[in-house]
Curated annotation (Swiss-Prot):
Keywords of this entry: Cleavage on pair of basic residues, Disulfide bond, Glycoprotein, Ion channel, Ion transport, Secreted, Signal, Transport, Viral ion channel
Disulphide bridges: 109-136, 122-148
Record's protein name: Pre-small/secreted glycoprotein
GO BP: any one term: monoatomic ion transmembrane transport
GO molecular function: channel activity
Species for this entry: Reston ebolavirus (strain Philippines-96) (REBOV)
Record's GO cellular component terms: extracellular region; host cell membrane
Signal peptide boundaries: 1-33
Record bears the keyword 4Fe-4S: no
Length: 367
């Protein structure tokens, strides 16, 4: 009997280690990491946000900061033919609009003006107070026609169209937007003793130097059968010169293409439409899919290095399109423009550690 009891009894040292491990598990369950709450079309009500994020986690809703996060950070294709396939028309679904407080710089934004075959508009005008997304590196301005089988254009993946501090579930006519979602950052309240010392006010030199701003470059397109399975996209160089876009490409590729056509006098010199097709051997992913360039450095990035040296035209299909011709066969080496680092290129996502103190749950950023 005694020996049996000895088998069930843990040695003193092992008992200490086991009880310590149990306490660690209990405390770990009490103080868990809390992720960001991502809000999509189906969770727009404040009460739902309170139940999901705020209950027993925050002392006040002032600790919630709504932030617009761009989808392009997830690595989605941003060229116009690929992006437009993510949008579709639906009827009978009321649009929803939600405000957000802060956002990111967008590498790619879009601006659509689409008409039906009878000349009527496919997209509604923006409501009062809805302005275009204010921070875009490239604005892809698309004009064209399509069947538009529905009242409003929605995002097929349930994402938002981000405008200036307003996010909507629908696309508005002629209003620049970025694709994204709304996230809620949970900020810990500062302790009172943080502010006991008198703050030191240092002089700040404000400047209106426009060379320090980011430049927005608008790229124009014409599209037919918008929203259909077989849509056709043309990059517009000028009113009479276009380039057929058959493959995914970077905005930097289109900038180089535009510069090459102009430098080599390949623009249309008549009233007829001249349509170029890019040689299939040319890689359309010059540069990077998402990077920043300042206005100060931008003009020199593509002027001296040209990696696109040959284009050819398709066989004429209408009398207005001029005869097929080919450029020289040589191909220069592809040179990638350098990436300009920026500390505010992305808003960091932060996790928060919560624990019970004096009967209240306190949250602080997790280090």
């Amino acid at each position: 009997m005694g020996s049996g009891y000895q088998l069930l009894q843990l040695p003193r040292e092992r008992f200490r280690k086991t009880s310590f491990l149990v306490w660690v598990i209990i405390l770990f369950q009490r103080a868990i990491s809390m992720p960001l709450g991502i809000v999509t079309n189906s969770t727009l009500k404040a009460t739902e946000i309170d139940q999901l994020v705020c209950r027993d986690k925050l002392s006040s809703t002032s600790q919630l900061k709504s932030v617009g996060l761009n989808l392009e950070g997830n690595g989605i294709a941003t060229d116009v033919p690929s992006a437009t396939k993510r949008w579709g028309f639906r009827s009978g679904v009321p649009p929803k609009v939600v405000s957000y407080e802060a956002g990111e710089w967008a590498e790619n934004c879009y601006n659509l003006e689409i008409k039906k075959s009878d000349g009527s508009e496919c997209l509604p005008l923006p409501p009062d107070g809805v302005r275009g997304f204010p921070r875009c590196r490239y604005v892809h301005k698309v004009q064209g026609t399509g069947p538009c089988p529905g009242d409003l254009a929605f995002h097929k993946n349930g994402a938002f169209f981000l405008y200036d501090r307003l996010a909507s579930t629908v696309i508005y006519r002629g209003t620049t937007f970025a694709e994204g979602v709304i996230a809620f950052l949970i900020l810990s309240e500062p302790k009172k003793h943080f502010w006991k010392a008198t703050p030191a006010h240092e002089p700040v030199n404000t400047t209106d130097d426009s060379t320090s701003y980011y430049m927005t470059l608008t790229l124009s397109y014409e599209m037919s059968n918008f929203g259909g399975e077989e849509s056709n996209t043309l990059f517009k160089v000028d009113n009479h010169t276009y380039v057929q876009l058959d493959r995914p490409h970077t905005p930097q590729f289109l900038v180089q293409l535009n510069e090459t056509l102009r430098r080599n006098n390949r623009l249309s010199n008549s009233t007829g439409r001249l349509t170029w097709t890019v040689d299939p051997k040319i890689e359309p992913d010059v540069g990077e899919w998402a990077f920043w360039e300042t206005k100060k450095t931008f003009p020199n990035n593509f002027m001296e290095k040209t990696c696109i040296s040959k284009f050819y035209q398709p066989t004429p299909t209408t009398p207005q399109i001029r005869a097929r011709r080919e450029l020289s066969k040589e191909k220069l080496a592809t040179t990638h423009p350098p990436t300009t680092p920026s500390w505010f290129q992305r808003i960091p996502l932060q996790w928060f550690q919560c624990s019970l103190q004096d009967g209240q749950r306190k949250c602080r950023p997790k280090v």
